[in-house]
A protein has these predicted regions:
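Active-site entrance/lid segments in N-terminal catalytic domains of soluble metabolic enzymes
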Residues: 1-154
Length: 154
């Protein structure tokens, strides 16, 4: 098959522009590594994980794939600093943030060579993510699962 090249494949170093959602309770290392091994971008859903559980999932994902994968991290959690420390220590290269202000952690993550993508529910929040230095955004509609915005039209 011919290589598929676009901004998404180039940004993440993946074969296909397919990004698996970082779903709380569902996106563990098995799913993320399978998606990454298939040429997409697997994402660990860290929202339901304590930092030590996240570390275990990252290590198992690394053992199961040599392809890029990321972590989805809701920013509203109380132990966010511990999660971020784990991500940095485990040398995760891609982080999707959501449910919070990306300006709080984006610069810190980028200082460690991490590509940062923020999930937004409106153009207003996309502009804020851009101003915070995020590398990309995911536009999420009201119909989306998880933490979504108050915009009822998408």
């Amino acid at each position: 098959m011919l290589p598929f090249k676009n901004k998404i494949t180039e940004l993440f170093g993946i074969q296909y522009p397919i990004i698996q959602a970082g779903m709380i309770w569902a996106s563990g290392w098995r799913l993320a590594s399978a998606v990454s091994n298939a040429g997409g971008l697997g994402i660990l859903g860290a929202g339901s994980m304590y930092p030590e559980v996240l570390k275990e999932h990252i290590q198992k994902c690394k053992a199961a794939t040599d392809k890029p994968f990321g972590v989805n991290l809701p920013l509203l959690y109380p132990d966010i600093d511990k999660h971020i420390r784990t991500i940095i220590e485990e040398e995760v290269k891609i982080v999707f943030t959501s449910a919070g202000n990306p300006a709080t952690w984006t610069a810190h993550l980028k200082q460690h060579g991490i590509t940062v993508v923020h999930v937004v529910s409106s153009s207003k929040f996309a502009i804020k993510a851009q101003q915070a230095g995020c590398d990309a955004v995911v536009a999420e509609g009201f119909e989306a699962g998880g933490h979504n915005g108050r915009e009822e039209t998408t």
